[in-house]
UniProtKB/Swiss-Prot annotation:
The keyword 4Fe-4S does not apply. This is MFS-type transporter opdK. It is found in: Membrane. The gene is opdK. It comes from the Eukaryota. It comes from Penicillium oxalicum (strain 114-2 / CGMCC 5302) (Penicillium decumbens). Residues 27-43 have a biased composition (Polar residues). Keywords: Glycoprotein, Membrane, Transmembrane, Transmembrane helix, Transport. Glycans are attached at residue 30. It is a multi-pass membrane protein. GO terms for molecular function: transmembrane transporter activity. Residues 1-26 have a biased composition (Basic and acidic residues). PROSITE patterns: MFS. Disruption phenotype: Does not affect the production of oxopyrrolidines A and B. The keyword Transmembrane helix applies.
Amino acid sequence: MSETRDPRTHSESSLEKGTHPPHQDELATNSTTKDASPVITSTPKKQGAKAWLSLAAGFMGMFASFGWVNCVAIFQAEYEMNQLRDYSSSQVGWISSVLFFFMLGVSPVAGRLYDGYGPRLPIMIGCFFHVFGLMMTSLATRYYQFILSQSVCSGIGTSLIITPAMTAPTTYFHDRRALAGGVTIAGSSLGGVVFPFMVNHLLSSIGFAWTMRACAFLILVLMVITYTLISSNVTHIPKEFKLKNYLTPLRECNFLLLCLVSFFMYWGMFIPYVYMVISSIHYGMSVQMGYNLIPILNGISFFGRIVPQFWARKYGICNVFILAMIASMVIILGSWLPSRSNAAIIVFTLLFGFVSGATIGLGPMIALTISPPNEVGYRMGTAFAVAGLGALTSPPIAGELITGNGGDYVYASVFSGVAYAVSTLVMVILRVRLGGWGLTTKV
């Protein structure tokens, strides 16, 4: 790290080695040639009030967007047992998978808006789509209406919120970017605790329609605060849209490997996220207790998104991420697969909540590490879009496996574990490319 290199050589190799060009004049030069490239205006050693307010805003934005998405398992169970009880698990699963797809797949658009206009424009548009979609969901009675409102409209809104909420605060924290990113992402865990409790208790008292409206009003308040407080430490210059900016990073082997890691990780992760509640009810857990699994999962996930950031700072992001992926695979196959009693299911929920939180929190930080600062927005969007393809397909595939196995969840669990195994293998290859075979090398 301390050796001196020619700036051009360093710039050309920076993406492959996971480092950033070190000179501000070099960044400024790149910004004139890259499309919608934000330019770093300063590198403060001490963060002021503006930085901390932006971090708080990012936390609230993730609370209202990804935090809401974290309670999809409740709606999978609710729809299968009530509103859409005439539909199969696979058909109901499309509501969640389409939501995941738009949440992740629209990220290139969100990244483009963020790079060109800053965090507030995509957050304002995303707030409208997210709140409007939930309001329309409160009126939905047919299958296609749930797809259009909760999956498409609200999904687009969450995507437009997540990218700037997660990215903008990190521009202030150059020395602790991973930790700052972990703090903002942890907002989704807290949202994943509050919203399930809120939905669970309101459904029985005020009904489905007003439950959705109450959640939408809370999200609206949080998003107004987020819009007011958030900012970034870069200058955003809108320029002509060029599709190649999103496709060019895929030519880089390291970035392509990271996209494959994301695809298979989300392929495996969203199966327990979607089917955890309904599978626990299937194996004898009460509906009330089954619904409470989601806030338990997300409560533990909060620590999973924060604590590993400190480990990553000491041992390396990639190293800690690989360990979390291996743990996820083992927990899926060794705990969720054989779990039939309430105690075993709760133990799985606690374990998976922590390790899944770690992978969700560390994954975007790896993308930040191997991307130059002036390309973070659309590179992050591209990686999320690829992950969205995995999120789109895994719940319906798992649903077909469940239906084909007489309603049992064994094959779906195996599918999830194998997807994690493939993702881990690809991540090991990426780690070796970045830091070599040394087990003690910090990567």
